[in-house]
């Protein structure tokens, strides 16, 4: 593994994206979110994505010529056509709109269709939490990979769901999880680091359990299992309804053979705590809950009980000090891309 100074990696990522066709402000936004994913320990959503994103611009999967537009709007709701634009930009604008509506009317619900790959839902939940809102979100991923409980053929994508809860002192509770037994990003991280993939995550094309990602990839291709058996399977269908059907994006399966890896249907919601009680009173109770959870005795083999989002913030603080960790394969791909784009200012490992 290599480590890079945060600011240097961020500048390099911006240059790569801009050189690959991303508009200036958007290249900065996407670079910030990708590097943030690496900082927080989610390299599958980090700078490893840059070559794919640029390839998607080249093949038309990402459309940078047409901006997102609001198709339908009410006091607390909006439907946004993402126009296949850069997913992080579409989602940031969508959550910002939901927050504005929540400030004015108590709640905001924005659905996005035809959005590009949106990255980590947690980023948009943090936007809501930092605004003193409770955030909710889900995505219908346009690339089929996950089966239903009892099945062996793909039904949905890894379709994430996420929640954000505001709290004092930067201790927001941020929960972001794939409805597959393991996210594609986590699996890619393990493959890059030659780490084992546990049992109960994948089936091969014949429906047999496998821990070999090469067997999963095929051909013929296998499937991911849902998390928590029938529970995760049910949650995945809800994400498909909210992100796919409600948004007008359509079922994920309709995009499988149309470059679906770059098409997301997204559901975003923010609602104002102050519609229910004073914000300080809410914060007091959340503080009490956090303190109570942290005071519980850890089970054997555990040193501490963590809240959703807490470990990610600790990793971020550590890597800001020690350098951002990037695996050698990802770095080689970025260097190759920099050479193709004639970008000569390249950061050195810390």
Pin down the residues of each PLM region.
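Residues forming anionic-ligand binding surfaces in small-molecule and nucleic-acid pockets
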Residues: 70-81, 92-108, 203-221
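Phosphate/diphosphate-binding glycine-rich loops and adjacent basic-rich segments that engage nucleotide
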Residues: 145-215
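Catalytic-core signal marking the mid-to-C-terminal active-site face
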Residues: 3-12, 19, 246, 251-350
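Small-residue-enriched flexible segments
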Residues: 183-248, 259-261
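A generic, well-ordered mixed alpha/beta core segment in the N-terminal half of proteins
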Residues: 79-168
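N-terminal glycine-rich anion-binding loops that anchor highly charged ligand groups
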Residues: 2-5, 22-48, 62-73, 260-263, ...
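Active-site cofactor/substrate anionic-group-binding motifs, chiefly glycine-
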Residues: 46-99
């Amino acid at each position: 593994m290599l480590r890079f100074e945060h600011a240097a990696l961020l500048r390099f990522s911006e240059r790569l994206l801009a050189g690959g066709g991303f508009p200036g402000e958007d290249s900065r936004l996407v670079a910030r979110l990708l590097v943030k994913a690496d900082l927080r320990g989610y390299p599958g959503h980090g700078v490893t994505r840059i070559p794919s994103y640029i390839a998607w611009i080249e093949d038309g999967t990402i459309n940078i010529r047409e901006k997102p537009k609001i198709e339908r709007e009410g006091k607390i709701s909006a439907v946004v056509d993402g126009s296949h634009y850069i997913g992080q930009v579409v989602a940031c604008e969508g959550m910002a709109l939901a927050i504005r509506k929540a400030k004015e009317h108590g709640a905001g619900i924005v659905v996005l269709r035809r959005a590009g790959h949106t990255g980590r839902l947690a980023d948009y939940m943090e936007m809501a939490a930092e605004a003193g809102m409770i955030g909710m979100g889900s995505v219908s991923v346009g690339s089929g990979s996950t089966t239903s409980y009892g099945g062996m053929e793909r039904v949905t994508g890894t379709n994430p769901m996420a929640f954000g809860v505001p709290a004092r002192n930067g201790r927001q509770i941020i929960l972001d999880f794939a409805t597959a037994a393991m996210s594609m990003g986590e699996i890619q991280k393990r493959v890059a680091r030659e780490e084992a993939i546990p049992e109960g995550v994948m089936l091969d094309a014949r429906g047999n359990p496998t821990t070999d990602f090469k067997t999963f990839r095929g051909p013929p291709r296998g499937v991911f299992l849902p998390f928590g058996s029938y529970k995760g399977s049910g949650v995945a269908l809800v994400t498909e309804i909210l992100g796919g059907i409600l948004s007008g994006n359509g079922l994920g399966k309709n995009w499988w053979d149309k470059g679906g890896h770059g098409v997301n249907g997204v559901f975003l919601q923010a609602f104002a705590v102050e519609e229910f009680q004073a914000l300080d009173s809410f914060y007091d109770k959340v503080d009490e809950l956090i303190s109570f959870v942290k005071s519980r005795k850890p089970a054997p083999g555990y040193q501490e009980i963590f809240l959703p989002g807490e470990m990610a913030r600790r990793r971020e603080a550590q890597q800001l000090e020690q350098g951002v960790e990037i695996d050698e394969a990802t770095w080689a791909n970025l260097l190759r891309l920099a050479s193709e784009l004639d970008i000569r200012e390249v950061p050195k490992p810390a």
